Design a protein with these regions (language model features):
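All-alpha RGS (Regulator of G-protein Signaling) helical domain and cognate RGS-like helical scaffolds
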Residues: 28-32, 60, 71-168
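Acidic, low-complexity proline/glycine-rich segments
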Residues: 22-42
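An amphipathic alpha-helical core segment
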Residues: 147-203, 211-220
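Histidine-centered active-site/metal-ligand motif
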Residues: 57-62, 102-105, 178, 196
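Short His/Asp/Glu-rich catalytic/ion-coordination signatures at enzyme active sites or charged loops
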Residues: 37-61
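Low-complexity, Gly/Ser/Thr/Pro-rich intrinsically disordered linker/tail segments
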Residues: 217-221, 225, 229-231
């Protein structure tokens, strides 16, 4: 390299380099089979997400996915041990559905934080640069992600993924919450747009819920998820 030449690393290359240094980053794909408490009180995301919704969402809906996954895995084990292969397809579908619910909710709680206490604002550092590289600007990304979330048909999620094949960030919709592995991607941020996530406060105004949600996004956690996904 000649003297005086300054080289710069692209944001996505910086992600890969930073990931190599993350010694204990939680790998998203390794979500443990455990039901954890929220990292904040149920009322911590007020006024953007109400306490009653958070309580029901976490203690009832997420808990049901966790319990359903445990049951499905236990039934699959019984089928294999007994040789009753006729039920494997049924319980495999149940396991995929409930695993998706447990997996995405475990991420969902962590990519939120109380406004002004880690939640809201705009991403900076490597994540901010990566978003700008992949979407043109943060505002363009926010507009595209919001549109994807509002437009999900029926129940599902809008998700920001790290695509492993070309190491790019992409926005995808998930109807319901399963079949995530078919995309060759790892979700690093997502919003639940099943009605149970917002109906008590916002009724049928999904767009209002999505717009309010940006005030509690935990960008530091999203960045850590990106580093973990790129390892």
């Amino acid at each position: 390299m000649s003297a005086g030449v300054v080289t710069t690393m692209s944001p996505m290359a910086a992600v890969a380099a930073r990931a190599e240094k993350v010694e204990r980053a939680e790998r998203i794909v390794g979500t443990p089979l455990s039901f954890e408490n929220l990292p904040y009180p149920y009322d911590a995301l007020e006024p953007y997400i109400d306490a009653k919704t958070m309580e029901l969402h976490h203690s009832k809906h997420h808990r049901a996915y966790f319990d359903g996954l445990q049951k499905a895995e236990a039934e699959l084990k019984k089928c294999r041990e007994s040789g009753d292969f006729s039920m494997i397809e049924y319980w495999s579908k149940k396991a995929a559905f409930h695993a998706g619910g447990h997996y995405l909710h475990s991420m969902f709680w962590k990519v939120m934080a109380p406004a002004g206490q880690g939640g809201g604002g705009t991403p900076d550092g490597i994540l901010g640069a990566a978003i700008a590289e992949n979407f043109g600007s943060f505002d363009a990304f926010k507009k595209q992600f919001t549109a994807a979330a509002v437009a999900v048909e029926g129940s599902g999620w809008a998700l920001l993924h790290f695509r492993t094949a070309d190491k790019q960030l992409v926005i995808l919709q998930a109807e319901n919450q399963h079949k995530l592995t078919q995309w060759g991607t790892v979700p690093i941020m997502g919003i639940d747009v099943w009605e149970h996530a917002y109906y008590l406060k916002y009724q049928n105004r999904r767009a209002d819920y999505v717009n309010a949600w940006w005030n509690v996004v935990n960008w530091k956690q999203v960045e850590q998820n990106l580093f973990a996904a790129s390892r």
